[in-house]
């Protein structure tokens, strides 16, 4: 190492490096976002801001607002104007550049008609040349749901069920029950459904086994909304209504229906009661959304599940006897399962449950013969269009079961099954075999393949 009087080369290099590291970049600046989250209710406008320090104009800089990917901006502002056509899908037509404070280094993005999907983190990136800095901005979106509704189901064998329902919440809320003295009560079940609009519906069930319980309250709340929504019910009063002593009767057996046919779900009040003034709801697993609603003598379409829109109708010829039939047209495989039929009035409901079994009988099996490389022979049996998953069976001419070499089931876009099964033929003396494909309800299709002369 070469040394100069009073200096060392390593010391000079270290000093030079220190100067480089501490030298102020000609474009040096930083970006600062708000210290606290920005709060906005669904449907309102939100204003996201960030500041350039030290203060200077951003008119000739690039300002990029984005969520997680800088290449997919919410908005891009460059050289004094918005760059069109680059906004993320879902923000197009809803974002606006605010120019009021560009001279002071403050920039703002307005999001109009805030939606639940707007909730979360945003980044504000400011760039000049190749130099950029960014800061994060947190937007917290909230929606206050509808006032809770408590209705009574039963009484049943385990007691009276109280169901607390509400819609239109964001983010996902919490639910709790209290007795008349403020004591917490344990829910039997709690279901939160995320709707097409991005909002949550709540269905919380409480079982009351103590006849002395009089008043019960349901509370629903979420973050950012300090006061919970509340509903209270006086139980003895509800249990004295006429409907509380009635019951709903539905089919005792599952209803079989083929794909494309019409499903008919019939429910009736017992004893017979005129149901014209009642609310009648057909549900799947939860209270919201519904398969079909009849209330105040009319059909309510607003609560209906998307997959049932335009496919349901109601037969009301015997409504004065408390009997109604829901028709679901053009049955699909997704319609299979359990349905709940509820009659209600003044917050008291009685229900029956109905099972639907959807089936589709597939095509006639096709059997083809294939010669293997080792000289052996296999038979391939194929068919499609089955639901639910069918049973496949090979048999010889005497009806004895033959073990298949392999079976494969595939579901297409309509959830119908395609079937393929292979049979290795080891005995050339067999005259013929059959391939049978059947459903649990007894529907069956069979194909026969002759093997004589091999």
Swiss-Prot record:
Q: Which residues form the Ig-like V-type domain?
A: 27-140, 148-234, 236-355, 365-452
Instruction: Provide the transmembrane region boundaries.
Output: 7-23
One Pfam family in the UniProt entry:
C2-set_3
Q: Give the Extracellular compartment stretches of this protein.
A: 24-454
Alphabetical list of PANTHER family matching this protein? BUTYROPHILIN, BUTYROPHILIN-LIKE PROTEIN 2
Record the organism: Rattus norvegicus (Rat)
- Classify the source by domain of life: Eukaryota
- The main location is membrane
* Residues carrying covalently attached carbohydrate according to the record: 210, 427, 432
Its biological purpose is as follows:
Negative regulator of T-cell proliferation.
The answer to whether UniProt assigns keyword DNA-binding to this entry is: no
What family is this protein classified in?
A: Belongs to the immunoglobulin superfamily. BTN/MOG family.
- What Gene Ontology biological process does one annotation of this record name? positive regulation of interleukin-2 production
Under InterPro entries, the record lists: BTN3A2-like_Ig-C, Ig-like_dom, Ig-like_dom_sf, Ig-like_fold, Ig_sub, Ig_sub2, Ig_V-set, IgSF_BTN/MOG
Q: Name one GO cellular component term.
A: external side of plasma membrane
Q: Which residues lie on this side of the membrane: Cytoplasmic?
A: 1-6
The record's subcellular location field reads: Membrane
Going by the UniProt record, its keywords in alphabetical order are: Disulfide bond, Glycoprotein, Immunoglobulin domain, Membrane, Repeat, Signal-anchor, Transmembrane, Transmembrane helix
What are the disulphide bonds in this sequence? 50-124, 164-218, 267-341, 381-435
Q: How does it sit in the membrane?
A: Single-pass type II membrane protein
Q: What is this protein called?
A: Butyrophilin-like protein 2
The reply to whether Zinc figures as a keyword in the UniProt entry is no
- Single GO MF annotation: signaling receptor binding
């Amino acid at each position: 190492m070469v040394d100069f009087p009073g200096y060392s080369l390593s010391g000079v290099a270290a000093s030079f490096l220190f100067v480089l590291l501490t030298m102020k970049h000609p474009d040096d600046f930083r970006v600062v976002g708000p210290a606290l989250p920005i709060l906005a209710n669904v449907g309102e406008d939100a204003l996201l801001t960030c500041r350039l320090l030290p203060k200077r104009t951003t008119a000739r800089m690039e300002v990029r607002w984005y969520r997680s990917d800088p290449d997919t901006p919410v908005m891009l502002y460059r050289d004094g104007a918005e760059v069109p056509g680059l906004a993320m899908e879902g923000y197009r037509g809803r974002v606006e550049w605010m120019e009021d404070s560009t001279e002071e280094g403050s920039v703002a993005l307005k999001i109009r008609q805030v939606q639940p999907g707007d909730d979360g983190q945003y980044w504000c990136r400011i760039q000049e040349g190749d130099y950029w800095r960014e800061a994060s901005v947190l937007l917290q979106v909230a929606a206050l749901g509808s006032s809770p509704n408590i209705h009574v189901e039963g009484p049943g064998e385990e007691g009276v069920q109280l169901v607390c329902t509400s819609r239109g919440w964001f983010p996902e809320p919490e639910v709790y029950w209290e007795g008349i003295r403020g004591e917490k009560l344990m829910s039997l079940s709690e279901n939160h459904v995320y709707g097409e609009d991005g909002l949550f519906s709540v269905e919380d069930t409480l079982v009351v086994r103590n006849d002395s319980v009089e008043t019960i309250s349901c509370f629903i709340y979420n973050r950012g909304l300090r006061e919970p929504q509340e509903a209270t019910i006086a139980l003895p009063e509800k249990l004295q209504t006429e409907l509380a002593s009635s019951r709903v009767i539905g089919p005792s057996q599952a209803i079989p229906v083929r794909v494309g046919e019409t499903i008919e779900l019939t429910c009736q009040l017992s004893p017979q009661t005129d149901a014209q003034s009642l609310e009648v709801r057909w549900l799947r697993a939860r209270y919201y959304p519904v398969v079909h609603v009849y209330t105040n003598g009319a059909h309510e379409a607003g609560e209906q599940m998307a997959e049932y829109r335009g496919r349901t109708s109601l037969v009301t010829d015997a409504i004065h006897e408390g009997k109604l039939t829901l028709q679901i047209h053009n049955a699909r495989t997704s319609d299979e399962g359990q349905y709940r039929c509820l009659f209600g009035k003044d917050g008291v409901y009685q229900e029956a449950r109905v099972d639907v079994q959807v089936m589709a009988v597939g095509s006639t099996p096709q059997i083809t013969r294939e010669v293997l490389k080792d000289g052996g022979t296999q038979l391939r049996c194929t068919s499609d269009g089955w639901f639910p998953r069918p049973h496949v069976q090979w048999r010889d001419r005497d009806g004895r079961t033959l073990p298949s070499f392999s079976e494969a089931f595939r579901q297409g876009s309509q959830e119908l099954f395609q079937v393929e099964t292979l049979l290795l033929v080891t005995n050339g003396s067999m005259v013929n075999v059959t391939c049978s494909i059947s459903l649990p309800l007894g529907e069956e299709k069979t194909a026969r393949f002759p093997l004589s002369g091999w």
